[in-house]
Amino acid sequence: FILRKTFFLSIIFFLSFSFLGIAQNDQDLIPLKSMAPDGIGPLSLPHLRHMVLGSAFVYNGDCPDLFIAGTGKTTELYLYKWLRNTENGVPIFDKPHKIASPFKLKGTIFQTDDHNVHALWLKKDSVIHTVFNLKKQSFDRIGGIELPELASLPQSIAARINKDQSVDLFLELVGHSIPAKYANQNPSSKEWRPYDEAGVSTTPLHYTYLCNIRYPRLLSGTPSVKQMVTHSRKETRWGMMNIAMVTLRKNDMQELICGSRLGNFTYYSRPELSQDTLSPRHYVVGSDNILLQHPSISASVCSYVDVKSGTTNIIAGGEGAVYFYKYSGEFTLDGHPVFSQPSPVLQVDADLYCGTLPVPSVIDWDGDGIEDIIVGNSDGHVLFFKNIGNNNNPRFIPKGRVQADGKDIHIQAGYSGSVQGTPESRWGYLSPTVVDWTGDGLPDIIMGDITGKYTLYVNKGTRTEPKLDAPQPF
């Protein structure tokens, strides 16, 4: 019992603190490593959220390397060196290296034909220009400009160098807004009312849109400003997170894919040298023509070139793992680009990644006499990690998402499921407790989640092959 309790508490403390980005004492907390073949597992940082900022051929490999910022209690910028791809084309990266930079968020990273890696950072109404120094592993400031007067402070930025060496900056601005119905409310107060009598959200709502500034050269010369290049000021609810320049059609087009807080990806295009309004908003879809939605909230996005085709795939981060979306080379008849379903981006020597805000339950799940881990997370999934070691020396491999009634368990708040209101719609906050509730010798799951409800998942399988039934509310 003492061993189990100590092991369980160690997991609780490690998972709770490491994924909040709280500084750790290496002597106190040792991350559990993935025991998957070659130690390969989902790319992850000890932070609450992953913000992908760009890719570039830093180490002259066959595929680009990746820049990611980790945010939470602390914010740091990291560089991942590309090592190889899986058979399905998913990139595998080396362990992350921390990068020094005067700024770490609200930026875009791109590479020019001279192989220099640039980063442009937003600082209120200015853009700061830095260049990557490989030897120093840092972005060094080389200049900056004050932006022309815009309708709002920019929220994110992307840069495109055109064939005539002019440079287009695309900036995300705050557009249409709806104030809160009730003033001076705090979610911690007894007066808090996230929904009115009709069940309609009372929380504030805002949308963002794109503007365009063209410079004759990179941040130099007299700019040409187009205050709005989208068809409305109501393009993306609660923000785009960031903007990626992509190449899908390969016919002298400017193409953009934007992330979003809710996890959808929007697509825009126009002829390269025009400064016309972008095409109407389209969405990234799957092969079934259904919109792709990132597995977690706050999806940031960057382009990731396919060196064989010359087109770009995308990599997206958020509050959870970082995912790879492969471009199919096709558009739907009505103009939506088709991408694959997301696959986790991988790294070597990976820590055991359970998602953000994991809640573990230690149990012998598969009846082999060795204690495994069942984990719920903020994405709204439940994961199974099998112990291939023993209880004195546990070694875990990820075995995927736990299912109920033949489907992955996936719970999120939706429009009205959170006491904090609709901004929490993409969170699940699953808290599984594994226990033999029915007394038949099989482990069942009692689940708490963001909705405040508790549900029971009865195990109708066998001791060695658990099979959960559909959930039953308490």
Language-model features: locations:
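Bacterial Sec-dependent N-terminal signal peptides
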Residues: 1-26
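Hydrophobic beta-strand segments that make up the repeating blades of beta-propeller
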Residues: 66-71, 117-123, 169-172, 254-260, ...
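Short, conserved, GDST-rich strand-edge loop motifs in beta-rich repeat architectures
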Residues: 171-207, 267
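Beta-propeller blade termini
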Residues: 49-67, 103-118, 153-170, 240-249, ...
